[in-house]
Structure formats: structure tokens, C-alpha cells
Regions:
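Non-catalytic, conserved peripheral segments adjacent to functional cores
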Residues: 1-92, 101, 108-110, 119-122, ...
Length: 151
């Protein structure tokens, strides 16, 4: 299947951070659900811009497509690069307060993943990075931050 077929088959819609998604389980603005899950599809010409979650852990699971790089900057400024694919890591855990972003390094095709967030995802605990603020915190990662932030 190609990206368009997955988007149609799974009923995906545009995501605020880039790519396409569909909530599968657990959106809970009351904070009572233990977790939430989504399908998330990223195309070669898009990215998941740097963002972080407060008080929530996110786990990404590879399903199909091209390898996906996930860039993670911890609060101390240490950068880790994880590649989700059939040949590399099949899942990656992102801890609360870590800035992270994702892209398809080959710039072709798409990648379909599943994401689980615990406790359940709440938009009030989601923060999209401001490029200038991230550059002040982590100037050593300037090239990556400039490429993986939207503003």
C-alpha cells in the first residue's frame, strides 16, 4: 500500500505537528484514562516538528514503510537519534520533557507508526517548540533545530 491508500483506509487526518493521524483509543480530557493510542503516518516531504509532552510518556511503534529517524534532546541537551524500521529499532520510548522530532531521512515514501501515550494524551500537556527558544537552550544542535522546527 502507498501513503494515500493508508490515509484513506485508516481514516487519517492532518496532525498539528505534521503528518496524519487517527485516535484509536483513550482521548481523555478528564485525565482518568491510563493511555491513548493513535496511528501516525509521515510522508517524505513532511516532518514531525520538535515538540514535547509534559507528564506523559510516548512510545512509537513501527508498522510499515521507510525508516524513520526520531531525534530526542533530553533536558541536559544530549541528542539521541533512533531509527524505526524493520531492520533497526521497532519501538522507541520518549520520556516526559524530552524534545523530539521525526523525519524520513531518505526523503522518499512514507512511514506508518503507532503511538501510545500514558497517561492518556491531553493537548494541554503538548508543547510545540519555538525555534528561537530551543536554539537558546541547545545551540550545539542548531542545524537540526533549524531544520526540524516550523517557526
Amino acid at each position: 500500500m502507498n501513503a494515500t491508500e493508508y490515509i484513506q483506509k485508516l481514516g487519517l487526518v492532518p496532525h498539528p505537528e505534521g503528518g496524519y493521524y487517527r485516535q484509536l483509543f483513550g482521548n481523555d480530557e478528564t485525565g482518568e484514562k491510563p493511555l491513548s493510542t493513535i496511528y501516525y503516518l509521515l510522508t517524505a516531504n513532511d516532518m514531525s516538528a520538535f515538540h514535547r509532552l509534559h507528564n506523559m510518556v510516548e512510545i512509537w511503534y513501527f508498522h510499515a514503510g521507510e525508516p524513520l529517524n526520531i531525534y530526542v534532546i533530553d533536558p541536559n541537551g544530549t541528542l539521541a537519534v533512533h531509527q524505526l524500521s524493520e531492520q533497526d529499532e521497532m519501538q522507541v520510548v520518549i520520556q516526559p520533557e524530552q524534545w523530539f522530532a521525526a523525519e524520513i531521512p531518505s526523503k522518499r515514501g512514507f512511514c506508518l507508526v503507532g503511538c501510545a501515550v500514558g497517561p492518556a494524551f491531553r493537548f494541554e500537556n503538548f508543547e510545540l517548540a519555538q525555534k528561537e527558544e530551543l536554539l537558546k537552550l541547545y545551540p550545539q544542535h542548531k542545524t537540526l533545530i533549524e531544520r526540524m522546527c516550523r517557526e
